[in-house]
Amino acid sequence: MLKEQLKEVEHRIQAACDRAGRKREEVTLIAVSKTKPVSMIEETYQLGIHVYGENKVQELTEKYEILPKDIEWHMIGHLQTNKVKYIVGKTALIHSVDSLKLAETIEKEAAKKNCVQDILVEVNVAQEESKFGLKVDEVIPLSLIHISEPTRLDVIS
């Protein structure tokens, strides 16, 4: 069943790439593995999926320890500063850096672990109090720090 579902997803990705004039290899499929058992991840891994997204630090670290080491892990959920130490160096990309404090904490932890951590910055452009994300006026200071000083953060977007 998973094999057929994966074929359908791949077909849809290819169709979207064709419509957008992009090559399939320019697009990364991230299988969201949150709440899924290790056995299901192992099955999709055998089908060729090697990039997974988790939204909970504890689940990510548990799965990281027992699944193949060539899996590329992405942190896709809200990340608290007190949990940064558990995922820096284990994740290829942190998708939800939503504050300067969080960026600074990731930077410090990456320095401790002597690694560079790729991140995506989440910006709250609507400036809604109920939403996560940097305020628009915080983006420039983060960008200036990243440009003017050598850092352990690689801001992908």
Q: Where are the language model's segments positioned?
A:
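Charged, compositionally biased N-terminal leader segments and the immediate start
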Residues: M1-R22
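Aromatic/hydrophobic pocket-lining residues that form the small-molecule binding cavity
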Residues: L2, L6, L60, V139
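Acidic (Asp/Glu)-rich catalytic clusters
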Residues: P68, G89, E107-N114, L144
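Glycine-rich anion/phosphate-binding loops
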Residues: S96-T105, I140
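Anionic-ligand binding region
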Residues: E129-L144
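Single conserved hydrophobic/aromatic residue that forms the stacking wall/gate
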Residues: I145-S157
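N-terminal active-site wall of soluble small-molecule enzyme domains
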Residues: R19-R22, E26-T91, L100-L102
